[in-house]
Structure formats: C-alpha cells, structure tokens
C-alpha cells in the first residue's frame, strides 16, 4: 500500500525534494531494488498480445522472468549496477493489511469469473490484475535468474524496503528503488521511483531526497514518521477525515502522534482505541535489517550457458532473443565502471565560482588598463 498521499505532501510542501531524471543520469550508480515490488509490477505489466500473462508450453507463468531479464538489461545497458532485495517474513503488525489484500484478491477472483460470463475483455483484464500476487516460486525463479546473470541479491530478514534503505544509508548503494513511498519512512537518503518501468512508457525516474523532504517540512525524523503513519501505511489504517494537508497541519499543531491521540477531538477524528501507531513507529525507526557491513555486493560475469538452459530449455524463451540479451549483459559487465568520478572528487558549489567571476573580470580590466600605451600629451 505504501504511504497514502505522501508524494502529494512532498509536492505541496517541499517540491525541491524531488527531481526527474533520465536513466542515463545514473551511469555508474549502485542501486538497491525492492524485488517483490518489481516482480509484482512484472506480473501485472508484462503481458502477451491477448492481455494475458506470459506462459510457456507447460502453462507456467513467465512474465516475472521476462520482466526481470529485460528490465535489468535496460539498467546495465545504461551503466547502472543493480542489486535486488527480497522480502523476508512480514512483521506481525502487517498481518491485518495482508489479510485485507487476500480478501480483495478473493473478491477480484469472483468478479473476474463473473466478468468472463457477462462482461467485456477489459473487465476480465481489470479483475485479473487485482488477483496477482508474488509467490515463493516467483521469488525463487527470479533469484536463480539473477545468479545466472551475475547480479547480486540480498534476502532481507523482514521488509525489503527497510533493507534497501539500510544499504543506502551505509553507502553500499547510491539509492533505494521502489514504488512504495514507505521506503522514505525507513530513512532511505535517496528513493528512486519508476526505475523498473519499461522503456516504452517513457516515464522519467523520480528521485526523492529524504534530507530535503524533512528540511522542507521542518520536521524531525520522528515527526516525519508520525506524519506517514497518520497518512495511512501498511501497519496502521488512516484516520477518517485526515487527508494529506490536514495530516501535516496536525503534526505541526500537536508535535507528534502521542499528543494528537491524547488531545484530538475524538468526534472530529475517530481514533480507534487499539490504533497501533506506537508499534508502527517502532517498526519504521527500528526496522529489522541485516547489518550493511555484513553484506558484500558483487557483480560477476554472466553464466551464458546457464541462462540458455534456464530461460530457453526450461522456460521456453526464444533462443535468439536470449542470446542477444546475453551479449548485452557481457558487454555491460566489461564496461560498467567501478565508481563515478563524483564519488572521488568534491564538487565545489557553483555559488563560489559565481562570486569569483566579478573579481576575475576586475583583475583582467586592471591588467588591460596598465598594459595599454599611454597617450602622448
């Protein structure tokens, strides 16, 4: 679910915290990607001409592998060094949200069957996408493919977004990449959205700065997390009557959720008695992650024959296309730099250069004046 309305809050209160870039701007950057979110995207978006998920002759879904292979190729073609992070066990507090998702999926399955009988193809497709979920098999097959491609991955002990954020905070990667805005609640210094979208969508990558966000809001980290909980997250339902603008106003007025829960008008803001905001706050501020210092990210040369065996022989992919993809992967593995120059050299702010310009111009003027021939009287 992410954080409801957070992108709108940032756009309204601190627009300088987000910028939009082309993928080429991230040449040489290491990025930790939320694998579960990516696989979910692939299962929904990577479809055949009939609108159905891609399958092999055995009836096995292959949309997730097609997406993982070609979207990863697009990244390495542009000089990025991706690593994927997979979800571990969900926190107990998330069980309610997971139960709601399961209920929605069951309802969508029933509506899809009904649409098959009386509805249009568009209706069937709409409800079919709502039934999508990432299974253990999808995860295992994605990990196998990444290993064959030489792309590192990490198994998070709990939430993948939290582990991505931890890797970014430790400097192991430049940014965390996910469509879920709650990645910012885990204090990822930089969040990239739309990184794993297809090239055909021509969607620029949105880069969110955590530091500029809390500076623009004039919030502490704790206040920002409280704001996100108030907006509505996977761990806590939102409070009826509290939208993005009102949530910002309430945190500024009360300072934190403790004061809001204690002092708020309960008729105006019906807060459930068992609203677990303190547990949610703890999950964001003290997330269960593997220590970044214990994680070594290594990008290796691809196992060309292994990829052919897995994708072509086992999963029924077109061999010619896979071989072209392998060639792109091999080329990228030889040309992607170890690091960017701007990570080694300190870039001076442009303001200093601007200040120096008038002085330099004045000096040139004096030099020109002194060297000019004097007029005879």
UniProtKB/Swiss-Prot annotation:
SMART domains: HhH2, XPGI, XPGN
One Pfam family recorded for the sequence: XPG_N
Keyword RNA-binding: no
Necessary cofactors: Mg(2+)
InterPro entries for the chain: 5-3_exonuclease_C_sf, Flap_endonuc, HhH2, PIN-like_dom_sf, XPG-I_dom, XPG/Rad2, XPG_CS, XPG_DNA_repair_N
Compartment list: Nucleus, Nucleolus; Nucleus, Nucleoplasm; Mitochondrion
Transmembrane segments: none
Comp. bias (Basic residues): 360-377
Ranges where the record places region Disordered: 96-115, 350-377
HAMAP family recorded: Fen
EC number annotated for this UniProt entry: 3.1.-.-
Coiled coil: none
SS bond partners: none
Record: residues binding DNA: 47, 71, 159, 232, 234
Family under the similarity heading: Belongs to the XPG/RAD2 endonuclease family. FEN1 subfamily.
Protein's name according to its UniProt entry: Flap endonuclease 1
Organism: Schizosaccharomyces japonicus (strain yFS275 / FY16936)
PTM annotation: Phosphorylated. Phosphorylation upon DNA damage induces relocalization to the nuclear plasma.
């Amino acid at each position: 679910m992410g954080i409801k309305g957070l992108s709108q809050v940032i756009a309204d209160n601190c627009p300088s915290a987000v910028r939009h870039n082309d993928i080429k701007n991230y040449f040489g950057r290491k990025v930790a990607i939320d694998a579960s979110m990516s696989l979910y995207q692939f299962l929904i978006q990577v479809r055949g001409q009939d609108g159905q998920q891609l399958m092999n002759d055995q009836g096995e879904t292959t949309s997730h592998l097609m997406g993982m292979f070609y979207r990863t190729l697009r990244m390495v073609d542009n000089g990025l060094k991706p690593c994927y992070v997979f979800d571990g066990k969900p926190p107990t507090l998330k069980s309610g949200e997971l139960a709601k998702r399961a209920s929605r999926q069951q309802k969508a399955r029933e509506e899809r069957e009904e649409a098959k009988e009386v509805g249009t193809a568009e209706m069937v497709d709409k409800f079919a996408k709502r039934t999508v979920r990432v299974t253990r098999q999808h995860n295992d097959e994605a990990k196998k493919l990444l290993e064959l491609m030489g792309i590192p991955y990490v198994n998070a002990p709990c939430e993948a977004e939290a582990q991505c954020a931890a890797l970014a905070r430790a400097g192991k990667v430049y940014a965390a990449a996910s469509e879920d805005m709650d990645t910012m609640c885990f204090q990822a210094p930089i969040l990239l959205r739309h990184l794993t979208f297809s090239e055909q969508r021509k969607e620029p990558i949105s880069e969110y700065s955590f530091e500029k966000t809390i500076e623009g809001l004039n919030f502490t980290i704790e206040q920002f997390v409280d704001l996100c909980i108030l907006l509505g997250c996977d761990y806590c339902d939102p409070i009826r009557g509290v939208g993005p603008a009102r949530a910002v106003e309430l945190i500024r007025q009360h300072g934190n959720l403790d004061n809001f829960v204690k002092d708020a008008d309960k008729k105006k803001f019906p807060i459930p008695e068992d609203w677990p905001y303190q547990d949610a706050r703890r999950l964001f501020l003290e997330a269960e992650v593997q220590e970044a210092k214990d994680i070594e990210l290594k990008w290796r040369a691809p196992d060309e024959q292994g990829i052919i065996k897995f994708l072509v022989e086992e999963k029924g992919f077109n061999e010619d296309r896979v071989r072209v993809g392998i060639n792109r992967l091999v080329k990228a593995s030889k040309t992607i730099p170890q690091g960017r120059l701007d990570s080694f050299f300190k870039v001076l702010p442009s303001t200093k250069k601007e200040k120096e310009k008038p002085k330099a111009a004045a000096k040139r003027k004096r030099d020109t004046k002194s060297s000019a021939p004097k007029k005879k009287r």
